[in-house]
Amino acid sequence: KTEKISTDVLIIGGGTAGCYAALTISENSDKKVLICEKAHIKRSGCLAAGVNALNAYIVEGRKPQDYVDYAKKDADGIVREDLLLTMSEKLNEVTDRLEKLGLVILKDENGKYVTRGNRNLKINGENIKPILADAVEKAKNVTVLNRVNIFDYSVKDNKINGAFGFGIESGIFYTIEAKAVIIATGGAAGLYKPNNPGFSRHKMWYPPFNTGAGYAMGIRAGAEMTTFEMRFIALRC
């Protein structure tokens, strides 16, 4: 069985980035958005199991460039400073938005965020993905296809105009046409040997289901790739 779908914006990957992108588009336009997620957006991506801190928040007395300097030093200078700065400049705004959606951020008796060091906020973030999933469900003009795996782009005249995928449970083959495509499939943690043996082999920061498919699709389609010279490896779970 095949199914053809048309949308304004296709978001491939329904993790934190994909969900937040959909919310941002929904709040700022009337574009139709389709999220395709190979798992389920309620518990998918790097933050599927939650997180207990925000490690790049710009606390009082600090500025975005301070985070850039820290990350650059930590990576021996192998960074795109412009990308780091852009992310750092927006993180506090995103944090405020997530708190309004229901994320619990710990505060002291004066109502100020509880910080650890120069760039860390303590949060109760075990439900960060369900919170985002609920917001996406309520967002206007946003549709979600869970358990649909996108495996390649549709390219015409050197421009990506959609993608192809299949339903993991239904077996339906999808041809999706889109005016714009956002790839939010995460990294490639699943390509590498885990740092824990046996039954604990998936006890790691990043989900083993991040296979690098988004990278591969981009490379095959001729997309410009960047920052591949730097690979972060979590030395602990």
Segments (PLM) and residue ranges:
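Conserved N-terminal/central alpha/beta ligand/cofactor-binding core
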Residues: 32, 38-161, 165-167, 172, ...
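Extended, hydrophobic alpha-helical segments in both membrane/secreted and soluble proteins
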Residues: 181, 210-214
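N-terminal Rossmann-like FAD-binding beta1-loop-alpha1 element of flavoenzymes
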Residues: 9-35
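Core beta-strand elements of the Rossmann-like FAD/NAD(P) dinucleotide-binding domain
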Residues: 3-7, 170-180
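A short acidic, glycine-rich active-site loop
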Residues: 201-210
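Acidic, metal-coordinating catalytic segment for phosphate/diphosphate chemistry
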Residues: 218
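Short, well-ordered coil/turn residues at beta-beta hairpins
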Residues: 13, 178-180, 184-185
